[in-house]
Amino acid sequence: MYRYKITIEYLGTDLAGWQRQAGVMSVQQILEEAIYKFSGEQVILFGSGRTDAGVHAIGQVAHFDLSKYLEPHKIITAINYFARPYAVGVWNCELAPNNFHARFSATSRYYIYRIINRPYPSVIDLNRAWWISSPLDVPAMQQAAVYLLGKHDFTSFRASSCQSKSSIKTLTELNIIKEDEEIKLYLSAPSFLHHMVRNIVGSLVLVGKNIWQVEQIKDVLEAKDRKAAGPTAPASGLYFVKTAY
């Protein structure tokens, strides 16, 4: 068997997320069906992360096995051809060792969350960022973010449907940068809880709106209660950027 590692980008707006689900179209299903059309083989695609409906990806990584060798550049061309008309594409493909696993071999995952912060919405960024019309206090958000860095119990920021056995995670990066009318939040960790990034963003926005004091983020973290945290930020602003191995 030959194991292939592919890197994928997609717009999640019209998709039900990464994972295959009955009755709806997912990224996994689109790619598995595309691979079958040119290889004749039924494959199972394993992704490095399971993005939700509406979430985008710039560098999602996945792997699959084929019984015959095909040149990686031809695989890219074939997948992109058969994945049409969906906004899903592969931009890298390479052979990987048989013990490589897109999910379990990962050492870190990186996300970006985009906020358009101006009085009027952006047509260009419709469904690709969270539009917030009121000015956000970015320095306050940056100060609050410091409380979340490191190893903590992130129960307050996990979805009620989260199936992770442990709520202990290590947030290695949480940088907030304002560029003109856009605010970007950069987050990285070995792994994340379900909705963890979006719940963190939703809470930091409350700080940015001066609804919460900076120190309240620390109180929310220590509460270990989802009800203590802010709302879940919209999926449209979230991008799965890359996975490190």
Swiss-Prot record:
The active site is at 52 (nucleophile). Substrate binds at residue 111. Keywords: Isomerase, tRNA processing. It catalyses: uridine(38/39/40) in tRNA = pseudouridine(38/39/40) in tRNA. Formation of pseudouridine at positions 38, 39 and 40 in the anticodon stem and loop of transfer RNAs. NCBIfam families: hisT_truA. HAMAP family: TruA. Belongs to the tRNA pseudouridine synthase TruA family. This is tRNA pseudouridine synthase A. It comes from Rickettsia africae (strain ESF-5).
